[in-house]
């Protein structure tokens, strides 16, 4: 029993690898994340687009409804998932980059809906993507770990 407990206690999660948003117009959403947020495309098909974020995370954009049934792939299956309504995603940015991001959003005619100064010293700005999802750009000082 002691060996089993040791194995269990050593099991650790490394990071959130993928975050998914569900969109009505896949091409429109992809253009937003490429043009406005400068994300690097990793993969695309008729169901989804995948983007690299910071070299270690992946943002997935699924065409709304297509993932609500089991996806059958050559290597196995992906169980159903979907989302509705305005969801939230936050991206980390450097302190010195906040003003540049605000200027970039203004250049793309994207309204900043909110700004927050956090007790730990971080700052966040909030805006919407074309599907109404709330996008946050946050500097360090938001959480104890970031």
Segments the model singles out, each with a brief description of its role:
Residues 51, 68-69, 122, 144:
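Generic structural signal for helix capping and beta-alpha/helix-loop junctions
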Residues 28, 96-101:
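Short, conserved charged micro-motifs
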Residues 2-12, 102-146:
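Vicinal oxygen chelate
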Residues 47, 57, 85-87, 108:
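A generic structural signal for short beta-strands and their flanking turns/coil linkers
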Residues 2-27, 86-89, 93, 141-146:
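N-terminal beta-strand motif that seeds the catalytic metal site of vicinal oxygen chelate
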Residues 64, 69-87:
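Helix-adjacent hinge/juxtasegments
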Residues 22-68:
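Core segments of cupin and vicinal oxygen chelate
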Residues 17, 37-38, 47, 87, ...:
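Residue-level marker for the onset of beta-strands and adjacent loop->beta junctions
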């Amino acid at each position: 029993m002691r060996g089993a407990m040791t194995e269990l206690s050593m099991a650790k999660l490394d990071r959130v690898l993928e975050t998914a948003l569900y969109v009505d117009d896949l091409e429109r959403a992809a253009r937003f994340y490429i043009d406005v947020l400068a994300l690097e495309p990793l993969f695309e098909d008729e169901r989804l687009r995948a983007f690299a974020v910071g070299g270690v995370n992946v943002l997935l954009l699924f065409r709304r409804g297509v993932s609500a049934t089991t996806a059958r792939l050559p290597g196995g299956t992906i169980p159903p998932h979907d989302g509705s309504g305005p969801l939230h995603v936050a991206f980390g940015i450097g302190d010195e980059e906040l003003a540049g991001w605000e200027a970039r959003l203004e250049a793309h005619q994207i309204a900043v809906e909110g700004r927050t100064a956090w007790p730990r010293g971080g700052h966040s700005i909030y805006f919407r993507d074309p599907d109404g999802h709330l996008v946050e750009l946050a500097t360090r000082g938001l959480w104890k770990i970031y």
